[in-house]
């Protein structure tokens, strides 16, 4: 592995990747993003994980997508990514879009895995500590849990932006009915939903019926939960 102290990103990295504006914003994202769901946890080879981040960055991939439960073990992907940043990317934080999510099971008890204000506020603080970041560029509600009112979740996401813990907000895997409520509330609050994530592949095209047209109606970009993640606008 290349010595981290000697790592310098290639000079032409931004010539290697097309970028698109995301939602109703001035933010551009690369056509391909790197998700850290697997291969970056505590059970994985840290040197290999580091090399994958470097390779991605050298090829114009600036968007790195995390979640608090990514690993395995849960939380370890965020911790490892934070270490990779400290050891290799000092001075390059402003060239990266780093996103994270919360809402799936993360810790024991009734507060460790839903879309409530209690869970989301605790989760983003934990995620910021694990990564060593001051803020996330994008923070998602990882799922609609079927119980928490969407209004509570959305108000929490908006407050997260107001508190400076995230620059933009998004939702992941929301059914159309709940997604519409979220889009409407965010737009009225002046913090429009930037992006939605969906399971979408040649084997799973259910979102084409309602979710994707709905995102287009509200000018919300979407990413495919596939490997790699591809941005659509």
List where the protein language model places each region.
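Conserved small/polar residues in nucleotide/adenosyl-binding loops
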Residues: 223-229
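Conserved, mostly hydrophobic/aromatic
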Residues: 22, 34, 64, 81, ...
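Short, well-ordered coil/turn segments that N-cap beta-strands
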Residues: 28-32, 60-62, 92-96, 133-137, ...
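N-terminal binding-site loop/beta-alpha segment at the start of enzyme catalytic domains
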Residues: 1-96
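Glycine/proline-rich, positively charged
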Residues: 54, 105-210
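Histidine/acidic residue-rich metal-binding segments in metalloenzymes
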Residues: 207-219
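Hydrophobic packing residues within well-ordered alpha-helices of enzyme cores
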Residues: 81, 179-182, 215, 233
